[in-house]
Amino acid sequence: MAGSGELKLLGVWSSPYAIRVRVVLNLKSLPYEYVEENLGDKSDLLLASNPVHKSVPVLLHAGRPVNESQVIVQYIDEVWPGGAGGRPSVMPSDPYERAVARFWAAYVDDKVRPAWLAILFGSKTEEERAAAVAQAVAALETLEGAFGECSKGKPFFGGDGVGFVDVVLGGYLGWFTAIDKLIGRRLIDPARTPALAAWEERFRATDAAKGVVPDDADKLLEFRQTLLRWSASKAK
C-alpha cells in the first residue's frame, strides 16, 4: 500500500512519458506527490535520481528512484498488482499476451516517437515535416491492425480496461492534438484508422486520463516554442 509521502513523481506536464506514469498511478488509485520539473533548470533531485539520462519521469518509491516510463509502469503493476484492493492490472496475466503487449509498446516508441520528435522539433523544411508525418501515419496504420489483435473486439488494447499499450500510446495523444493543428489535419484520422480514432475518444474519457492528457493545442505549441528556444540557446 502506498502511504502518504511514499510515492513522488518528477515530471513535466506535457511529457508523454510522465503522462503514462500519471495515468497508471490514477488507474491504481495510488496517492502520490507530483513535482513539476523545469527542463531549462533541472532540479538537483532529478539530476541525482536519474544521473544517466537526466530526464523525466522519475518515480521515487520510499526515496528509491525508478527511471524510464515503460519500466516505471511495469514496476507499479508489479508492486501494486491487479486484484489487490480492487486495483486493475496493466500488464496481461498470460505470459504470451504480456509478450505481445511489450512488443507493441516497444513498437510505439520505436516508430511513433521519432516521427513525433521530427514533426515538432527536427523538421527544418516542409518536405522534412511531410516525411515525418508520413512516417507517423504509417506507424498508426500498423497500430490500427494491432488494436484488432490485442483488443479482441473490446474497447482497449488491454481488453475491457486500459492496459500497457493503451498507456504507452495514450501518452502521445496530447501532442497529437498539437500536431493536428500544426499540419491542418488529424494524425489519427477516423477515415483511415477508425478503430484508433474511437479508441482515442474512449481513452481520453477515462477518469485516469482526464486532467492528465493535455487537450490545449495552443498551450502545447507555445511550450514547443519554449523548448525550441532552449535547444537553440544550448547550441550556441
Curated annotation (Swiss-Prot):
Positions annotated to bind glutathione: 15, 42, 56, 68-69
Organism field? Oryza sativa subsp. japonica (Rice)
Under the heading CDD domains, the entry gives: GST_C_Tau (cd03185), GST_N_Tau (cd03058)
Q: What GO terms are given for molecular function?
A: glutathione transferase activity
Record GO cellular component, one term? cytoplasm
List each copy of the GST C-terminal domain by range: 94-228
* Entries under Pfam families matching the protein: GST_C_2, GST_N_3
Report the sequence similarity comment from the record: Belongs to the GST superfamily. Tau family.
Question: GST N-terminal domain location, by residue?
Answer: 5-84
InterPro entries, per this entry?
Answer: Glutathione-S-Trfase_C-like, Glutathione-S-Trfase_C_sf, Glutathione_S-Trfase, Glutathione_S-Trfase_N, GST_C_Tau, Omega/Tau-like, Thioredoxin-like_sf
- Its EC top class is transferase
| Sorted UniProt keywords | Stress response, Transferase
Role noted for this protein? Conjugation of reduced glutathione to a wide number of exogenous and endogenous hydrophobic electrophiles.
The alphabetized list of GO BP terms reads:
glutathione metabolic process
Q: What is its EC number?
A: 2.5.1.18
Q: PANTHER family from the xrefs?
A: GLUTATHIONE S-TRANSFERASE GSTU6-RELATED, GLUTATHIONE S-TRANSFERASE, GST, SUPERFAMILY, GST DOMAIN CONTAINING
What superkingdom heads the lineage? Answer: Eukaryota
What PROSITE patterns does its record include? GST_CTER, GST_NTER
Q: Which reaction does it catalyse?
A: RX + glutathione = an S-substituted glutathione + a halide anion + H(+)
The identity of this protein, by name, is Probable glutathione S-transferase GSTU6
